[in-house]
């Protein structure tokens, strides 16, 4: 595939076939993570591939209690969503309740001593540390699309990091950063994703000054 076609059609896949992902294809997808940049080339990212049914079920059991309060809030009218988001909610709910049936789960980990954010002294949430982690994650997502595989990124399980670390025997000095799902999609890939135009996000010299 052309790179631009991969970029424009890598979507969040929430419906998966139960077909296994071939070993060689999986290896190529995972290997793409190695080429993500990191500060000082410290390469803090590590991956745990989970295909064992019991472990996937245990991860689903951790995921659902975090997800269900959001659904209840919508059902009770406490959280308002649009009709479009209502369709997305249905897909996300299916995803949450079928996590154990996804062929491959990939736990993304990072060794924090190799992540050196430069914004921790600012009076806001630190975001810079992710620059050494999430490029590797994006590489996996794009590589999966190139191989005809669907994928999704979720960070919800980071809320229960202790339990995830215990289940997957993650060392004390390694933290959880995300979990990816991987498999053959039930639905066709979109030809192009719905994104805001470049004119709404790219500025000339100063913020808000039109570039285009």
Indicate where each model-derived feature is located.
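N-terminal amphipathic, basic helical "cap/leader" segment at the start of enzyme domains
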Residues: 1-101, 210-212
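C-terminal helix-cap and adjacent tail motif
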Residues: 5-6, 12-13, 176-212
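Short, charged/polar surface micro-motifs in flexible loops or helix N-caps
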Residues: 52-57, 65, 112-113, 162, ...
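A generic local secondary-structure boundary/capping motif
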Residues: 94-97, 166-170
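Short coil/turn connectors at secondary-structure junctions
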Residues: 101-104, 149, 172-176
